[in-house]
Regions:
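The alpha-helix within a helix-turn-helix
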Residues: 24
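Short gly/ser-rich loop at a beta-strand->alpha-helix junction or flexible surface loop bordering the NTP-binding
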Residues: 2-4, 12-21, 29-176
Length: 176
């Protein structure tokens, strides 16, 4: 199997994204990635982050790509987790991220990053994320989503099995 085929197999399960550290872990020489980008088989998205050229875009690509651009300790947080799970309408132009370590990378203007925050991260749709109860609380505290939409999102999250009834009621009381 060629290096590109190895990267392709991995990237298709990860929203078309492969990082340098992931490629090295799969046995691909890190110097091959810039060469593949120069040939046009990979598209460089940011420092150490590449997109497989033949990737067919999916609905949640923007979230996965944003987390990858922010680094290995990054995660989706707040309103972006709510948007990922389609629990409430949010501003699609802004992606809210957190990171457990300091992030020094220069990120696109639409990414709102808060670093040095601990997180008990979970995977939603294969994307590292803040747990939904914490995400709803963060979105409410930051004013990223209106209070009535937070209550509706909590009910919907409960209906889909993401929240317990006690957690749902806590959010409904908090916004009342």
């Amino acid at each position: 199997m060629t290096a590109y085929e190895t990267l392709w197999d991995f990237a298709e399960d990860h929203y078309g994204i492969v990082t340098t550290s992931q490629a090295v872990a799969m046995g691909v020489d890190k110097h091959q990635l810039p060469a593949m980008a120069k040939r046009g088989t990979l598209i460089k998205k940011g420092y150490g982050v590449y997109l497989v050229k033949h990737h067919i875009p999916k609905e949640n690509d923007v979230f996965a790509h944003s987390v990858a651009l922010a680094g290995e300790t990054a995660y989706l947080r707040g309103a972006s987790v709510v948007a990922l799970l389609k629990l409430a309408p949010t501003n699609p132009g802004i992606v809210y991220l957190g990171a457990t370590s300091r992030v020094r990378r220069r990120l696109p203007a639409n990414l709102r990053l808060v670093d040095m925050r601990p997180c008990n991260c979970v995977q939603y749709e294969g994307i590292r994320s803040q747990p939904i109860d914490e995400a709803l609380r963060t979105a409410l505290d930051e004013g990223a989503i209106e209070a009535d939409r937070i209550a509706d999102a909590a009910v919907k999250a409960h209906d889909e099995g993401w929240l317990t009834e006690a957690e749902m009621n806590k959010f409904i009381r908090a916004v009342s």
